[in-house]
């Protein structure tokens, strides 16, 4: 019996968002504020589409490292005196093409402004001398805490096989708080999808919570612009993402649609309400079962049975992780359902 999982295809060869392939911004060495004795070389021009976001390196001041992921490190810093987060994308020695793709994918949200999306402030492909960085992205500082940390209380824990911290029970998240955070995330998805952008790696670890208790979607390194996908005769399937949150149609190598984010949201909402990890077991076994046998996390927890709002929330989750992408609700319909449910809860 052939496997329902798709063979991993090669990435397309060009990821620059512009036909102008020149490097973005400058300098190749950091200025005196970051590296004593360095000089500022002449700044090459950005690709025309991104010229507005060239980095003024003299205004950058790194403060502390916040963490590291599969494609780079994130630092807290100030830029022009304002708190920001700075992401340095590594030159992945095993798959540099994937690193390049991650860098340019992060800029899919350049110029976009929304309360529930982490904003890109500036970007550059110029890096400090001797560094292993492919490029630098300066982003709005969305907060010190991720939704993953709020759910599991996992701040400071080592990373697990799925690229997230090992889980332990966190503080209580009320049903009302789950719905509040869910509305933030769905509002962000609705905006992204209206711009023909799909995130493709939505999960609690990629959702920041600001000091104002607002959820902001971050980490667009796996994102795609739907219009770009249509430009290639052979489909482009992102290599990144987190397998526990990945829609079954993507695991099978089918086309990318916004409904893949809706599936990921369903797993995320399930995590918020149960405070549990979605699956346990061998990665390949889970992938096969999700595709071949419609494996999903259990909805037998008391939170989905003890109250009418809990039952309705379980129904919402079930609709969002249906095997057929066409049968899942859009972000707009989901927003209506969750708003109604939150009003019912009071």
From Swiss-Prot:
Query: Which GO BP terms sit in this record?
Result: chromatin organization; establishment of meiotic spindle orientation; MAPK cascade; meiotic spindle organization; negative regulation of metaphase/anaphase transition of meiotic cell cycle; oocyte maturation; positive regulation of ERK1 and ERK2 cascade; positive regulation of MAPK cascade
Query: What are the alphabetically sorted keywords of the record?
Result: ATP-binding, Cytoplasm, Disease variant, Kinase, Nucleotide-binding, Proto-oncogene, Serine/threonine-protein kinase, Transferase
Q: Carries keyword Cytoplasm?
A: yes
Active site (catalytic residues): 201
**Tissues expressing the protein:** Highly expressed in oocytes. Lower expression is detected in early embryo.
Known disease link? Oocyte/zygote/embryo maturation arrest 20: An autosomal recessive, female infertility disorder characterized by early embryonic arrest and fragmentation. Early embryo fragmentation is defined by the presence of anucleate cell fragments derived from the blastomeres. Excessive embryo fragmentation is associated with deleterious outcomes, including decreased implantation rate.
Record protein name field: Proto-oncogene serine/threonine-protein kinase mos
- Source organism per entry reads Homo sapiens (Human)
Name of the gene encoding the protein in the UniProt record: MOS
């Amino acid at each position: 019996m052939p496997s329902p999982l798709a063979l991993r295809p090669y990435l397309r060869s060009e990821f620059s968002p512009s036909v102008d392939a020149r490097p973005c911004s400058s300098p190749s060495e950091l200025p005196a504020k970051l590296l004593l004795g360095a000089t500022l070389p002449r700044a090459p021009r950005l690709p025309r589409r991104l010229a507005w976001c060239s980095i003024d390196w003299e205004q950058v001041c790194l403060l502390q490292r916040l963490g590291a992921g599969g494609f780079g490190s994130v630092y807290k810093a100030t830029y022009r005196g304002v708190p920001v987060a700075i992401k340095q994308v590594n030159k992945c020695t095993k798959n540099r093409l994937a690193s390049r793709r991650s860098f340019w994918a992060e800029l899919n949200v350049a110029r976009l402004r929304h309360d529930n999306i982490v904003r890109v402030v500036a970007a550059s492909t110029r890096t400090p001398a001797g560094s292993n960085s492919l490029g630098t992205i300066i982003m709005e500082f969305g907060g010190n805490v991720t939704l993953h940390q709020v759910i599991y209380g996992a701040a400071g824990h080592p990373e697990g096989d799925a690229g997230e911290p090992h889980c332990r029970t966190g503080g209580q998240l009320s049903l009302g708080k789950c719905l509040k955070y869910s509305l933030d995330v769905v509002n962000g998805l609705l905006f992204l999808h209206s711009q023909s952008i799909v995130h493709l790696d939505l999960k609690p670890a990629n959702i920041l919570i600001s000091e104002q208790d607002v959820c902001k979607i971050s980490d667009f390194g796996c994102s795609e612009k739907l219009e770009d996908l249509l430009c290639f005769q052979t489909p482009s399937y992102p290599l990144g993402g987190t397998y526990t949150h990945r829609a079954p149609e993507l695991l099978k190598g089918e086309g990318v649609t916004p409904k893949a984010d809706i599936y990921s949201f369903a797993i995320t909402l399930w995590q918020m309400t149960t405070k549990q990890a979605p699956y346990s077991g061998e990665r390949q076994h889970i992938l096969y079962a999700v595709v071949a046998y419609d494996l999903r996390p259990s909805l037998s927890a008391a939170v989905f049975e003890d109250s009418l709002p809990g039952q309705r929330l379980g129904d919402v989750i079930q609709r969002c992780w249906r095997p057929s992408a066409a049968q899942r609700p859009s972000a707009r319909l989901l927003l209506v359902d969750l708003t109604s449910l939150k009003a019912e809860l009071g």
